[in-house]
Structure formats: C-alpha cells, structure tokens
C-alpha cells in the first residue's frame, strides 16, 4: 500500500539506499496482483505486433540503420527502402540516433514513412519503423504525440537513460496507440556485476514489461555483447510467461 502503482517508488523501495550498503544484488521480486493491476502493460504484446505485421508463424526480423551517425534523412530513407525490400520486418534507429541537427526526428520520420509506403506498394509487406524519440520525459512525450499524428507506427526509447516511469507514461497514454520498443543502452550498469545491481531477468524482463514495452532489444549469447545463455533464456521467460493481466513482450 505504500507504493501506489508506480515503478520509480517500487525501485526505491526494493533497491534504494540498500544498493549502497555493500555486496547486495536484487535477484527477483514477486509482485502481487493488487499492485500489477495498476499497470496497463504492453498495448500490443507479441500477438499484437504479429497482427500489425501480418506474420503468424515465422520469426520477426529486426534490423537497424548502419551507418547512422551523420547520415541525413534522405540517406536513411534510402537505407530503409533497401532493408524493407531485403525482408526486414522492423527497422529501428540506432540508440545514438536521437534528434541530431543533421537528421532530426520529424524529417527522418517523413523520409522513412515514404520509403515504407514505396516498399509496401512493391512487395505488399508491412514494415514497422521504430523511431528513436529519446529525450527528457516532457520532450519525449511531445515527440511521441507528434510522431504518432504524423503517421509513426512504432517508437523506440532508450529506457534505461530516461527511466521506467517515462516509458510507462507513453504506454498508458491512449493516443499513443502504436508499439513501444525498449533499447538496452546503459542496462549493463544494473546487471553485469556478480556482486551488485539488479538481475538481468528483472531489469531486461519483468520491469520493462510492467512499464509497457511491447518489444525489447537485449544481448544474446551470440552477439557482439554476449550474454550467458541461461540469462537470455530467463529474460525471455519473464517477457513471455503469464503475468496477471499483462500482455507479453516480444524478446529481441
């Protein structure tokens, strides 16, 4: 009853001052239904994302712009078109590509939506563009609303730099009726130490799902930032297992 349905105070209660008290790790927490019912969670979940893409029985393929830093909107639009023709289902911004002067959010969105429409006319395949709107909470919310009204079909947030509360604000807004993707930048600060921090299954699994992330990117045992296989499996279980009324979150 002391935590009134918000993640910032939940984290403060579970791992606040005690995080500075020595070798202590938060491994897991069982949240009661009375607490979880305060959250709407993911709007779409795995099944909802599959419906948007009209993909029923195959893996969903996600790719990102490379190179991205310094690339103007028209260049990114061209890359988007080529990636869409190549079979990518979700094309995401790099976590470093937020709102630079050379490629602002509005212009980037316009070019990539045109590319998505062109690719759809040629292939009949839908592609989601997870545009990075990371900013201060107020500015990020304004960007989310503006992007949605401009036709955006997916949003990406560097959740561990803006906070779970800011993500939850987006997820719970009825006007922002498009999927939200969490990027893991800075998440390693929480889970990599064997002696301190918060387990990867909580920080990359249970908490972003509670906050309303429809999709989350996280390391795999085979990528450039390898994650122990058992941890990767545990994260996936947290994202997909029954969690009261909450929809699942797509692991990525």
Please report, for each region that a protein language model flagged, where it lies by residue.
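Phosphate-/polyanion-interacting regions in eukaryotic proteins
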Residues: 1-40
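N-terminal small/glycine-rich loop or linker at the start of catalytic domains
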Residues: 41-71, 117-126, 175-178, 182-191
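Active-site mouth loops of central-metabolism enzymes
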Residues: 59-77, 127-139, 187-201, 252
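A cross-domain feature marking catalytic cores of carbohydrate-active enzymes
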Residues: 65-67, 95, 131-135, 157-159, ...
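Conserved, mostly hydrophobic/aromatic
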Residues: 83, 147
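Glycine-rich, proline-tolerant flexible connector loops at the mouths of alpha/beta enzymes
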Residues: 88-109, 220-227
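Catalytic cores of extracellular degradative/oxidative enzymes
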Residues: 101-104, 113-117, 128, 135-140, ...
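Catalytic alpha/beta core domains of metabolic enzymes, predominantly
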Residues: 142-144, 150-252
């Amino acid at each position: 009853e002391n935590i009134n349905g918000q993640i910032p105070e939940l984290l403060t209660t579970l791992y606040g001052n005690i995080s500075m008290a020595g070798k202590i790790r938060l491994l897991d927490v069982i949240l009661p239904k009375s607490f979880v019912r305060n959250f709407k969670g993911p709007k779409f979940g795995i099944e909802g994302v599959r419906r948007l893409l009209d993909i029923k029985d195959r893996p969903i393929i996600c790719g990102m712009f490379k190179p991205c830093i310094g690339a103007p909107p028209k260049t990114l639009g061209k890359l988007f078109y080529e990636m869409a023709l190549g079979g990518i289902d979700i094309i995401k911004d790099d976590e470093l590509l937020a709102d630079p002067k050379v490629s602002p959010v509005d212009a980037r969105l316009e070019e990539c939506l045109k590319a998505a429409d062109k690719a759809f006319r040629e292939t009949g395949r839908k592609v989601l563009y997870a545009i990075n709107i990371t900013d201060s909470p107020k500015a990020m919310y304004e960007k989310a609303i503006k992007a949605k009204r401009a036709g955006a079909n997916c949003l990406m947030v560097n959740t561990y730099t803006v906070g779970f509360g800011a993500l939850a604000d987006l997820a719970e807004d009825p006007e922002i009726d498009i999927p939200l993707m969490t990027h893991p930048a800075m998440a390693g600060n929480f889970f990599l130490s064997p002696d301190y921090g918060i387990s990867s299954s909580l920080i990359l699994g249970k908490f972003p799902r509670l906050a309303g992330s429809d999709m989350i990117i996280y390391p795999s045992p085979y990528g450039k930032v390898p994650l122990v296989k058992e941890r990767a499996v545990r994260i996936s279980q947290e994202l997909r297992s029954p969690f009261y009324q909450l929809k699942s979150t797509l692991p990525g």
